[in-house]
C-alpha cells in the first residue's frame, strides 16, 4: 500500500508526519509545488520525494493538501492519469469548503473521496479530524485511510453537510470526552 501527499504545507505536512508514525515512512510519497519543501520533509520523515504525476499514478491513498482555490488547477493535468488507472485508489481532501461532488468534478470522475477537516495538532497526535466519505468509498478504503490517520489523534465521522461546522463539532467532541479522560473508571 502506498500513500501520497500532494501538498506538504502546514496541514499536509502535519498529516504526512502523523501517517509516517502510524504506518511507517517507507511507503509515503511527498510532493509540493516547491520541490525543496517536499524533499526536506521526506528527509526528515524517511519518506520519498516525488511529483504529482508519480503520486497520482502509483499511490493507493492520495492526500490532497492544496488550497481550495488551487485544487481545480492542480487536478486538471492529473485527470488523464486518474482516468487511466486500473487499480483502486482513494482521494483524501483536506480542502476547506470543497464538497465531495465538486472535488469529483475537478478530478474528472466519480472516484472514491474521503473529505477530512483536520487541525495542525495532528502532527503530534493531539488532533481532532472529522471526516465524511463519498458513496464510492469501500469499507476497506475507509479503514485504510483511518489506519493512516490513527496517529493523528481523534477521528470522527460526520455528515458532509456538517463539514462547514467541523471545527465547532470537533471542539464539542473534545469537550464531551474531556471529563471521561480526567475521571478514572472504578
Q: How would you describe each model-predicted region?
A:
Residues 10, 36-37, 69-70, 98, ...:
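Short alpha-helical
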Residues 29, 122-157, 166-172:
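Short beta-strand and adjoining strand-loop segment in the mid-core
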Residues 15, 35, 44-45, 53-57, ...:
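Rossmann-like NAD(P)(H) cofactor-binding subdomain of soluble oxidoreductases
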Residues 1-57, 126-127:
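NAD(P)+-binding Rossmann beta1-loop-alpha1 motif at the extreme N-terminus of oxidoreductases
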Residues 103-110, 154-164:
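Short, hydrophobic/aliphatic alpha-helical segments
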Residues 1, 26, 47, 89, ...:
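A structural micro-motif
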Amino acid at each position: 500500500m502506498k500513500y501520497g501527499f500532494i501538498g506538504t504545507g502546514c496541514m499536509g505536512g502535519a498529516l504526512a508526519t502523523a501517517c509516517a508514525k502510524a504506518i511507517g515512512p517507507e511507503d509515503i510519497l511527498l510532493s509540493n509545488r516547491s520541490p525543496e519543501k517536499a524533499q526536506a520533509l521526506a528527509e526528515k520523515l524517511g519518506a520519498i520525494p516525488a511529483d504529482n504525476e508519480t503520486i497520482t499514478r502509483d499511490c493507493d491513498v492520495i492526500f490532497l493538501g492544496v488550497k481550495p482555490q488551487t485544487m481545480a488547477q492542480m487536478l486538471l493535468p492529473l485527470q488523464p492519469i486518474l482516468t487511466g488507472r486500473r487499480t483502486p485508489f482513494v482521494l483524501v481532501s483536506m480542502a476547506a469548503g470543497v464538497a465531495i461532488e465538486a472535488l469529483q468534478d475537478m478530478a474528472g470522475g466519480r472516484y472514491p473521496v474521503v473529505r477530512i477537516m483536520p487541525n495542525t495538532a495532528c502532527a503530534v497526535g493531539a488532533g481532532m479530524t472529522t471526516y465524511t466519505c463519498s458513496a464510492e468509498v469501500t469499507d476497506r478504503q475507509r479503514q485504510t485511510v483511518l489506519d493512516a490517520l490513527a496517529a493523528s489523534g481523534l477521528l470522527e465521522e460526520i455528515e458532509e453537510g456538517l463539514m462547514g461546522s467541523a471545527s465547532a463539532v470537533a471542539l464539542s467532541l473534545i469537550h464531551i470526552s474531556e471529563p471521561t479522560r480526567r475521571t478514572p473508571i472504578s
